[in-house]
Amino acid sequence: MIGLVGKKVGMTRIFTEDGVSIPVTVIEVEANRVTQVKDLANDGYRAVQVTTGAKKANRVTKPEAGHFAKAGVEAGRGLWEFRLAEGEEYTVGQSISVELFADVKKVDVTGTSKGKGFAGTVKRWNFRTQDATHGNSLSHRVPGSIGQNQTPGKVFKGKKMAGQLGNERVTVQSLDVVRVDAERNLLLVKGGVPGATGCDLIVKPAVKA
């Protein structure tokens, strides 16, 4: 089963009939329009390419305009691709709504996490801080030793150090689907998802469900 592209609206909470508060993320899933269907003969694999939302005409490049015109769909804010399973069939120009998830219990959500800039090891990797006193006057938040001796004489790859934090592709798996609102094109999932408000999210049925 393919996924859909949506937009993060924000977080809120809803209550069950028993009065239990459930924190949910609201994802707006506008109709995904099929722009291309790839097959084994021409592309070597089966997939469907979709777009969603709208893009100003003066922001659409000529190659994009031709691609959207060939498919007969309105220019969207981007292009995304989903692999097709055996038996799944879609046609160019077809519109896919959030009702795709009507019978889905859990989903995986992929997005770009918030960028935090250059961060130290305490914030980036949850390193423990060193003593505030007891003779320590300079090394409160430094990482400490990053290696051994003349042997091996190098810092190993993957060593946790200070650097860019966030702004990377992150997937949160197996989030419960709390509600599918087809009228307002909304999908409510339990818990938080990566990224800032307004960012694009890829929602797929959970692989571990």
From Swiss-Prot:
Any GO BP annotation: translation
Protein family per UniProt: Belongs to the universal ribosomal protein uL3 family.
PTM description: Methylated by PrmB.
Function: One of the primary rRNA binding proteins, it binds directly near the 3'-end of the 23S rRNA, where it nucleates assembly of the 50S subunit.
Cystine crosslinks: none
GO CC terms in record: cytosolic large ribosomal subunit
Protein name: Large ribosomal subunit protein uL3
Domain of life: Bacteria
PROSITE patterns membership: RIBOSOMAL_L3
Complexes and interactors: Part of the 50S ribosomal subunit. Forms a cluster with proteins L14 and L19.
Modified positions (N5-methylglutamine) in chain numbering: 150
Keywords: Methylation, Ribonucleoprotein, Ribosomal protein, RNA-binding, rRNA-binding
Chain's gene name: rplC
GO MF: rRNA binding; structural constituent of ribosome
Cross-referenced InterPro entries: Ribosomal_uL3, Ribosomal_uL3_bac/org-type, Ribosomal_uL3_CS, Transl_B-barrel_sf
Presence of keyword Ribosomal protein: yes
